Amino acid sequence: VAIRPLRVGELAEVLAVDFDDSEGIPRLNADWRWEDQEQALLIACSSLIAIVEPGDGNSDVESGKSRVVQFSHFSVKEFLTSSRLSNASGEVSAYRIDSENAHTILAQACLGSLLQTHDEIDGNTSKDHPLAEYAARHWTIHAQFGEVSSRLQKGMESLFDVGKPHFKAWLTLYDIDIRPPFISTFSAFIPYNKSSAAPLYYAAFCGFHDLVEHLILNYPEDVNADGGYYKRPLIAALAGEHFQTADLLRHNGANPHVRGDQESTPLHSAAYFGKLEVVQKLIEYDADINARDEYEWTPLCWSSRGVHFKDGSVLRLLLERGANVNARADDDGCTPLHRASRFGALEAVRLLLEHGADVEAVSYHNMTALQVVGKSNPKAGQGRCAEIRRLLIEFGAK
């Protein structure tokens, strides 16, 4: 389940983790480290593994830096992960690899490594803490698998404790907020904010619900603290589509009304990218459905552009919830119908017309929707553009 092939030193470090600490926090035990790491791994895994030079196809493992560990044959992995193995008789069933347990062990090992690092990150960090680089980049991915995070609560609470140096050290090694592992839902509108974000922001961003609850209890002032790529913990939770966590933040006073550089709101962005569930949540949180950005564009304007237009569900929802179907943009005087026509979004045009869009509205350039069909989307195709023109004429365009 490793995100990339593990180097010998990284996997050997896992053998030095005490998973049975009395406080429930994984800890590295320096006395458990082997001087001959390859021998340690071969003793533990025998012929199930092979230690090889890193392959050229994996850019995340630099050639010549360290040998990597892999299964000796693809059939070994198939056998160890097979459901049939769990039903086998005798001790052999204990060797079955369960994905959730494997992610749990790797996440715990990563936490154990990060909890040994401090804020003095330098060139010796990788040497002194072989697993630290991998841990900083990937531990959250392992922790997000299934119910893994619920098994890591004590370790995560320790890592996210602002009174200790580990949290800062982790972000110094690799800041997941700078290179988000999730699809960037709001990046086009909410600007990157280099100011440091509170631990609550990162917990929300990753969707660690129990950890968010713990941090709200201990640091309630951070619920609306500014900082980070998405500016607020609530918006970070929505960007990762962690809706239960977002509800928890909202219930504890999180304010969804934030603005980007161009005065755009999260609703503008969610509408543009066609994120239906995010749009639903923002409306539930009383977001202004007719909010205008710097150019007087509303969320409906962005939704109707068609670049990320899917099945019309977002546009339909906005219209049903009272979005102004004829809202004009300040920069060019175009309405949502102009946008949808210009980008060749047939279903958007149909929905807007059915909800009363002014088919004869004229932009500041003296153009109607009929005159701009397909102008901004060469891929729209002649057939679709012809259908849009037919539809506009059917609704009264001249």
Task: Explain the meaning of each model-derived region.
Residues 1-225, 232-251:
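Leucine/isoleucine-rich amphipathic helices and adjacent mixed helix/strand linkers
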Residues 202-207, 236-242, 269-275, 302-311, ...:
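Ankyrin repeat A-helix N-terminal signature
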Residues 191-200, 226-234, 259-265, 292-298, ...:
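Ankyrin-repeat boundary/"N-cap" motif
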Residues 211, 244-245, 278, 313-314, ...:
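Conserved ankyrin/ankyrin-like repeat signature
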Residues 355, 374-398:
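Ankyrin-repeat-protein effector appendages
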Residues 120, 149, 222-223, 256, ...:
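Alpha-solenoid repeat scaffolds
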Residues 223, 239, 257, 264, ...:
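"… SH3/SAM/PH, and C2H2 zinc fingers" -> "… SH3/SAM/PH, FHA domains, and C2H2 zinc fingers"
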